[in-house]
C-alpha cells in the first residue's frame, strides 16, 4: 500500500474507489494499491 498525495491508475486493471472518504486504488496487482493521505 502506497500512501500518496495524488493517486492515479497505473494500469488498465486499476480501479479508483472511495472508502470512508478516502480515495483508493485497488488492482489485481498488489503493487498498485494506493491510498490518498
Swiss-Prot record:
The record ties this protein, via InterPro entries, to: Ribosomal_bL36, Ribosomal_bL36_sp
MF GO annotations: structural constituent of ribosome
For this record, the Gene Ontology CC terms, alphabetical, are: chloroplast; ribonucleoprotein complex; ribosome
Question: One GO BP annotation here?
Answer: translation
Q: Does the keyword Transmembrane apply?
A: no
Cite the entry's keywords alphabetically.
Chloroplast, Plastid, Ribonucleoprotein, Ribosomal protein
Q: Where in the cell is it found?
A: Plastid, Chloroplast
Chief localisation class: plastid
What family does this chain come from, according to its entry? Belongs to the bacterial ribosomal protein bL36 family.
Indicate what this protein is called per its UniProt record: Large ribosomal subunit protein bL36c
